[in-house]
């Protein structure tokens, strides 16, 4: 028969969450560098392996996100609610930055407009 088949390929972005997770993983493994005498990047710690073309590198350390800093606009984490059972970013271990945290129980009464 004289039928044709058509195949179309296109690039598509990954899910936003996957992109964010990948960037966070790269950020956590970023390699500290310094500007050398010849204005080239050098490892700050010569005992580490040089970064690959896919690695993130940095010249300045990140600000301390735990404490308030008006210059950078960081509000810090003091007074924020954390999740005691989470190992993620909302977990008390990370969010409280080693300062410890207060625990409390709260009972919330809400109208749920339930129908039986």
Swiss-Prot record:
InterPro entries: Wnt, Wnt_C. It is found in: Secreted, Extracellular space, Extracellular matrix. It holds the Pfam family wnt. The keyword Cell membrane does not apply. Glycans are attached at residue 83. The keyword Nuclease does not apply. Gene3D superfamilies: 3.30.2460.20. One of its GO terms (molecular function) is frizzled binding. This is Protein Wnt-5(II). The lineage of its organism: Eukaryota, Metazoa, Chordata, Craniata, Vertebrata.
